[in-house]
Regions:
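N-terminal soluble domains immediately following signal/targeting peptides that reside
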Residues: 433-602
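Internal/C-terminal transmembrane anchor helices
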Residues: 410-436, 645
Length: 645
């Protein structure tokens, strides 16, 4: 543990050495390792199909024995789970490091990046293995949803989607470095390329869900007995929707640490979006109790991540919502409205999630969130929260009905409701992006020193001009970060227009200390102290005992490293990320739709042939005296295997 703390301290001392892209050395190492790993992966998969490489055979049989599923589903899903856990741990550690220490000089200077890269590569590898492990000569080969690659090679739909989502995330890494070179290092979770990394990994769960539907159908239509262990099935029904809930909650990270750089209304909107999509889909697709199981898995995973990042690694604590009320609502509605009427079920769930569930999350923010939702935001929270919950629940009902389409009738109105809801969600997420930049607000700050030593701290008294400048504000905080920790202190009102910190704030070293104000659609900041940064370059901000300063856009304070480019470069960069994102979303929608419309189709006895496959000529019996082949392994009866079918 001491060596781990030493490595983190080393990051802190070298963090300011770069404010653009990674060094040529880091790029060379990353490119070489990634290229070599991709080549090995592709050659290994193709070699396994041609039976020239047998390395995967042991893993193939092992995954079948422990799960009871065919290897083209069990091995990729197991690898994807491990990879997602690795990536999400790296993500939360990485965000905490940036909040506490600031930017890093390169890819390999931050140990959390290794976990993220390994996890994303594992996701891509899982999808590729699923594509390569499906064999047409097996009775349990993928069914009619499979995508034809060659005459006798059909890839599982879920495997292709996992591979695509992993590739989308991996593409975010080189684009992120390119973005830093153009616009500086964006120390925010919601940087465009950062969202690519998060979004691709989170949406991998959709590919896993589809491949699980495919394997159930394939085993059923093959006439083979279902040998999936009961504990595997029950665990899958918990971790799959729970994992999707964890993935969708990562987008709320701007608010989990208490340093949001976007409007606070996003927080309830994103919570309602995750609850509506995930919990409604889980109940419609998987049956009773699955929404509660998903929330239990979510709380366990996020709790473990919080303990690892905060208690074990000594970084800032990431907070999270509960979703318990929303899960109870979904399970309760199912007693009144049949899930076989998904349109009505989704609408009722959305209405209750957007009212009762929203009220529960409102209360939870006042218990365990760094920035609670104030009553000044009540009206817009009700409007946007309710609208988002209904739209998300209709999308979740559509997803659940597609994944469980063998027992839930198709609904054309539900399909169009989901399309309209998707457009509404996009519009609602885009609306709060626009913020007010100009302001005439200023403040006089008086600092009462608490510790006058080299680690100077002080109580700040802030007098606003005009005095009503913070009336109806959504937050008014003193924030100090990137100096070895994080402080988010909600100011105490002393009198009209006069506010005071409730604890001393740091005014030394690498700390960046400021007053932050969010009122209406304006997010403003006033610097109190900041060190000089020659890498950008920017001069330091001194903290005399008394001073007057204006407020301005707090993006200039929180993203000191950011720089502007010509308009065509900026629009071109954003358009590139947008096209990639729309491609991922289109792939997900197409995959979910395809798994639904093929539910009633029967698989042909042999792909591409309208009748039974041609009979094979009998192979000659081997001569026992000259037979040098290895005997087939004999597994215990309780370890079923699909190998050789």
């Amino acid at each position: 543990m001491s060596s781990l703390y030493a490595s983190v301290s080393a990051i802190a001392t070298t963090a300011a050495s770069s404010a653009g892209g990674a060094s040529a050395r880091d790029l060379g190492i990353a490119g070489g390792v990634s290229g070599f790993a991709i080549i090995v992966l592709l050659m290994g998969g193709l070699g396994h199909r041609s039976e020239m490489v047998t390395t995967l055979t042991w893993f193939e049989r092992f995954s079948e024995r422990v799960s009871g599923q065919p290897a083209w589903a069990s091995l990729p899903c197991g690898l994807a789970i491990i990879s997602l856990l690795t990536a999400v741990f790296g993500l939360y550690w990485d965000v905490s490091l940036h909040v506490d220490r600031g930017r890093d000089p390169g890819v390999f200077s931050n140990p959390s990046h290794i976990f993220i890269l390994a996890g994303l590569y594992g996701i891509f590898a899982a999808g590729w293995f699923s594509i390569c492990l499906s064999r047409e000569e097996r009775a349990d080969r993928p069914g009619p949803t499979a995508i034809r690659i060659t005459r006798d090679w059909y890839a599982p739909l879920g495997g292709l989607m996992m591979c695509g989502a992993g590739l989308f995330s991996l593409l975010g890494f080189p684009l992120d470095d390119f973005w830093h070179r153009l616009f500086g290092q964006d120390v925010t979770l919601w940087g465009p390329t950062h969202l690519m990394l998060i979004g691709g990994a989170a949406m991998t769960l959709v590919g896993i869900a589809i491949i699980q539907v495919e394997v159930r159908r394939a085993v059923r239509s093959s006439g083979l007995p279902d040998r999936e262990y009961g504990w595997v099935r029950h665990l899958r029904h918990v971790w799959l929707p729970g994992g999707l809930l964890v993935g969708m909650s990562t987008f709320q990270g701007e608010f989990d640490w208490g340093v949001p750089q976007f409007q606070l209304i996003y927080h309830p909107m994103l919570i309602m979006l995750a609850a509506g999509v995930t919990l409604v889909a889980a109940r419609v697709w998987l049956g009773p109790g699955r929404a509660l199981g998903a929330v239990a898995f979510f709380i366990a995973m996020r709790g473990i991540l919080a303990l690892l990042v905060h208690d074990s690694l000594g970084q800032s604590l990431p907070h999270f919502p509960l979703y318990i009320a929303e899960a109870l609502i979904v399970e309760g509605v199912a007693f009144v409205v049949a899930v076989k009427r998904p349109l009505l079920f989704g609408a009722v769930c959305g209405a209750l999630i957007g009212t009762v569930g929203l009220a529960a999350e409102w209360g939870w923010t006042h218990v365990w969130m760094p920035i609670p939702w104030p009553r000044e935001m009540l009206a817009e929270t009700i409007v946007f929260g309710l609208a988002m919950a209904v739209a998300a629940s209709l999308i979740g009902a559509w997803m659940g009905s597609r994944l469980g389409s063998e027992r839930i009738p198709h609904s054309i109105p539900l399909r169009w409701a989901a399309v309209a809801s998707s457009v509404a969600v996009a519009a609602m997420l885009a609306f709060p992006l626009f913020t007010q930049s100009g302001t005439d607000l200023s403040a006089r700050v008086a600092l009462r020193t608490v510790d006058a030593g080299p680690k100077r701290t002080a109580i700040a008294t802030v007098t606003l001009s005009p005095r009503n400048g913070a009336d109806h504000a959504k937050w008014l905080t003193a924030t100090a970060w990137q100096g070895g920790g994080l402080i988010t202190d909600r100011l105490r009102r002393v009198s009209e227009g006069v506010y005071e910190t409730t604890r001393p704030v740091p005014l030394y070293g690498d700390w960046k200390t400021m007053i932050r104000l969010h009122k209406g659609n304006a997010i403003l900041g006033l610097p109190i102290y900041a060190p000089a940064d020659p890498a950008i370059p920017l001069p330091g901000v001194a903290a005399p005992p008394r001073f007057d300063r204006p407020f301005f856009s707090d993006h200039e304070l929180l993203q000191r490293e950011a720089r502007t480019q010509a308009a065509w470069i900026t629009w071109g960069a954003y358009l590139t990320v947008l096209v990639c994102t729309l491609g991922l979303l289109a792939m997900l929608a197409w995959g979910i739709h395809r798994i639904g419309v093929t539910a009633g189709r029967r698989r042909l006895p042999h792909p591409g042939v309208a009748g039974p496959p041609p009979p094979r000529e009998p192979e000659p019996e081997p001569d026992p005296e000259f037979d040098t082949s290895l005997p087939e392994p004999v597994w215990p009866a309780h370890f079923p295997t699909y190998a050789g079918r």
